[in-house]
């Protein structure tokens, strides 16, 4: 009877499970932002200086105080991070009164731009439709 374990002479690629296990243990570098409404959200360290709306209020994630969670049993550290020195970076301008949402186009009952009105469509008599159905 053959042994059910694979032969040690054959080459097999490394298991993907081992790679996933290592990736899961890697610490995610993110910061926690506490909002005035009592909610909190986490943002990745590389995604700083972006804004969003929450409960009708616009928020910027460009605060100077970042709470870094390094994973494991370590307590959070408070650090002041300077913005990355990149000359092509857009300056951090976050105005809570700006509204970047485009208004909806009003719907109308007029004819579509691509189709002519129903008056311009050719009318076919009953004999035409009888020939089509009998075909």
From Swiss-Prot:
Transmembrane segment boundaries: none
Entry comment on modification after translation: Phosphorylated.
Alphabetically ordered keywords of this record: Activator, DNA-binding, Host cytoplasm, Host nucleus, Host-virus interaction, Inhibition of host innate immune response by virus, Metal-binding, Phosphoprotein, Suppressor of RNA silencing, Viral immunoevasion, Zinc, Zinc-finger
Subcellular location(s) per record: Host nucleus; Host cytoplasm
Intervals of motif Nuclear localization signal: 17-32
Domain of life: Viruses
Signal peptide range: none
Assembly mode: Monomer. Homodimer. Homooligomer. Self-interaction correlates with nuclear localization and efficient activation of transcription. Monomers suppress local silencing by interacting with and inactivating host adenosine kinase 2 (ADK2) in the cytoplasm. Interacts with and inhibits host SNF1 kinase. Binds to ssDNA.
An example Gene Ontology molecular-function term: zinc ion binding
Function text: Strong activator of the late viral genes promoters. Enhances the expression of the capsid protein and nuclear shuttle protein. Acts as a suppressor of RNA-mediated gene silencing, also known as post-transcriptional gene silencing (PTGS), a mechanism of plant viral defense that limits the accumulation of viral RNAs. Suppresses the host RNA silencing by inhibiting adenosine kinase 2 (ADK2), a kinase involved in a general methylation pathway.
Gene Ontology biological process terms in this record: symbiont-mediated suppression of host innate immune response
Chain spans, region Transactivation: 120-135
Domain notes: The zinc finger and the transactivation region are involved in PTGS suppression.
UniProt-annotated stretches for the region Disordered: 82-102
Organism: Mungbean yellow mosaic virus (strain Vigna) (MYMV)
Family: Belongs to the geminiviridae transcriptional activator protein family.
Record protein name field: Transcriptional activator protein
GO CC terms in record: host cell cytoplasm; host cell nucleus; viral capsid
ZnF (unnamed) residues: 37-54
């Amino acid at each position: 009877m053959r042994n059910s374990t694979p032969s040690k002479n054959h080459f097999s690629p490394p298991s993907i499970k081992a790679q996933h296990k290592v990736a899961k243990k890697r610490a995610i570098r993110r910061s926690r932002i506490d909002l005035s409404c009592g909610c909190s959200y986490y943002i990745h360290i590389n995604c700083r200086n972006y804004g969003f709306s929450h409960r009708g209020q616009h928020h910027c994630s460009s605060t100077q105080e970042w709470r870094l969670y390094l994973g494991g049993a370590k307590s959070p550290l408070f650090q002041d991070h300077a913005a990355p020195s990149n000359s092509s970076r857009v300056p951090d301008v976050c105005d809570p009164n700006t509204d970047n949402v485009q208004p909806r186009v009003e719907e109308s009952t007029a004819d579509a731009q691509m189709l002519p009105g129903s008056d311009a469509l050719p009318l076919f008599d009953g004999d035409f439709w009888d020939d089509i159905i009998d075909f």
